[in-house]
Amino acid sequence: MAKKSLNESSPVARFEQSLEELEQLVQKMEVGEMSLEQSLTAYERGIGLYRDCQQALEQAELRVRLVTDPARPEQAEAFEPPSLDGG
């Protein structure tokens, strides 16, 4: 049986590319040398990239749940990342 390949247009397949572009956009905006119009355009693009990344993470979490317990994906425990505040 052939292995399934990720659809190149899926958010999961584009996650790293979107995250890298978002990081570059933030760096450019932090420099503060953009015009107001450029800043607004960059902000709008950043929001779109953020949403793409969030959707990719949600889809990846669902895939993990399905692999963990394919018979009962609705009862699989949600992944809770460790707290960054040390608590």
Swiss-Prot record:
SUPFAM superfamilies linked to this entry: XseB-like (SSF116842)
Role, per record: Bidirectionally degrades single-stranded DNA into large acid-insoluble oligonucleotides, which are then degraded further into small acid-soluble oligonucleotides.
GO CC aspect terms: cytosol; exodeoxyribonuclease VII complex
Subunit structure, as described in the record: Heterooligomer composed of large and small subunits.
Family per similarity comment: Belongs to the XseB family.
Enzymatic reactions: Exonucleolytic cleavage in either 5'- to 3'- or 3'- to 5'-direction to yield nucleoside 5'-phosphates
EC number from the UniProt entry: 3.1.11.6
MF annotations from Gene Ontology: exodeoxyribonuclease VII activity
Subcellular location: Cytoplasm
InterPro entries attached to this UniProt entry: Exonuc_VII_S (IPR003761), Exonuc_VII_ssu_sf (IPR037004)
Species this protein is from: Xanthomonas campestris pv. campestris (strain ATCC 33913 / DSM 3586 / NCPPB 528 / LMG 568 / P 25)
Alphabetized Pfam families for the sequence: Exonuc_VII_S (PF02609)
Protein name: Exodeoxyribonuclease 7 small subunit
UniProt keywords, alphabetically: Cytoplasm, Exonuclease, Hydrolase, Nuclease
GO biological process per UniProt: DNA catabolic process
